[in-house]
């Protein structure tokens, strides 16, 4: 059961799998295991696909769960949490555990993975999640969490109610989320998130070009990226950007705008990738004729273009390094300015950042020269 096996169930069955569970797995898996245990036929079970001799049999889909609170609490007692704690401690860090508060995403970015849960959005209640956090704190002394939702707190007033529930339970936690800049700007969301313990938020900034954002069907504005970043920093919440290069129609001018945005807004971290055509997406349909024999992740390596973009894979690999160096340079300059104004702000990390400026500067110049050469040879 996975998004990949749901999309490519024939390959999994041909490789020897007995059954593939399509979509959500909890109810179907429970019923399937019961039938196997009782040596009963599963041929009429909703939500599975299997082979009958050489024929693929796809049963009707199972209706998606709407009230996630009906599910029992995750069986953390089956996990050796102490072993994970030890690994984190060896790296000088406190353990962080993953929690899923929602399923699905109602937005329609045309390049995004077709979610296993469909274009919908169901969530646990703030009270359920607070109860789970309380259990993890009491039993494993865990207070750091990664909320692994595609979109955290989309429902109106969810984050505000979550903040209230945590206060009522006297829980002080630190957590990281993924969100959208337009969602963060609604009502008093950032205030409630900061009060409840939000440490860092990863947002899909994607591009500094409004033209590219519109082409992606992203549904966000550059002005929202700027405003959300500003407000998060005011609340001392770290903000990190997902950045995507290589989308159809992207020019070197669009790339320059993205780099300029990163340097100006100074996110606390960045994750850089190239546009990737996942089967089941609108973007895949747009570029599938260029893929030839390539298909999905098996034919792609790090930052490799699978379709004919404006530039080739070598360009984007070099661009990845260049963007990170320019980003680190701009961080060093900012740290230097802050320390000049207020020397008490100096720290080992800031000092290291400033010293690395002298490494990144000549290296970035060489990368820029190589990129310019690649751009000219591409004309």
Predicted segments — roles?
Residues 1-65, 274-280:
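Glycine-rich beta-alpha loop elements in corrinoid/cobalamin-binding modules
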Residues 14-17, 37-40, 192-193, 219-220, ...:
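Short, hinge-like loop/turn segments at secondary-structure boundaries
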Residues 74-247, 260:
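Radical SAM [4Fe-4S] cluster-binding motif and immediate context
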Residues 8-14, 249-264:
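Catalytic cores of alpha/beta
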């Amino acid at each position: 059961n996975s998004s990949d096996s749901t999309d490519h169930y024939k390959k999994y069955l041909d490789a020897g799998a007995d059954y593939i569970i399509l979509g959500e797995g909890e109810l179907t898996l429970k019923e399937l295991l019961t039938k196997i245990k009782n040596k009963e036929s599963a041929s009429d079970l909703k939500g599975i696909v299997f082979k009958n001799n050489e024929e693929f049999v796809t049963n009707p889909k199972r209706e998606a769960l709407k009230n996630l609170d009906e599910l029992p609490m995750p069986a953390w007692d089956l996990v050796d949490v102490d072993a994970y704690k030890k690994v984190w401690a060896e790296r000088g860090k406190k353990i962080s555990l993953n929690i899923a508060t929602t399923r699905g995403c109602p937005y329609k970015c045309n390049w995004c993975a077709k979610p296993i849960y469909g274009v919908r959005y169901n969530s646990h209640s703030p009270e359920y999640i607070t109860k789970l956090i309380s259990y993890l704190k009491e039993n494993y002394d865990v207070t750091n969490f990664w909320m692994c939702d595609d979109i955290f707190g989309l429902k109106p007033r969810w984050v505000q109610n979550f903040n209230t529930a945590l206060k009522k339970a006297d829980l002080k936690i630190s957590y990281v989320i993924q969100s959208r800049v337009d969602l963060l700007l609604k009502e008093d969301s950032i205030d409630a998130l900061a009060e409840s313990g939000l440490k860092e938020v990863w947002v899909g900034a994607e591009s500094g070009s409004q033209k590219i954002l519109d082409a992606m069907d992203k549904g966000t504005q550059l002005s929202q990226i700027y405003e959300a970043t500003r407000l998060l920093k005011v609340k001392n919440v770290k903000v990190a950007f997902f950045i995507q290069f290589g989308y159809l129609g992207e020019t070197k001018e669009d790339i320059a705008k993205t780099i300029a945005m990163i340097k100006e807004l100074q996110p606390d971290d960045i994750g850089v990738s190239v546009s990737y055509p996942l089967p089941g997406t609108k973007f895949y349909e747009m570029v599938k004729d260029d893929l030839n024999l390539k298909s999905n992740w098996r034919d792609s390596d790090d930052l490799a273009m699978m379709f004919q973009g404006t530039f080739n894979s070598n360009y984007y690999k070099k661009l990845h390094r260049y963007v990170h160096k320019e980003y680190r340079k701009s961080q060093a300059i900012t740290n230097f300015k802050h320390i000049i104004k207020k020397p008490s702000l100096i720290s080992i990390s800031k000092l290291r950042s400033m010293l690395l400026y002298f490494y990144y500067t000549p290296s970035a110049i060489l990368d820029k020269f190589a990129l310019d050469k690649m751009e000219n040879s591409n004309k």
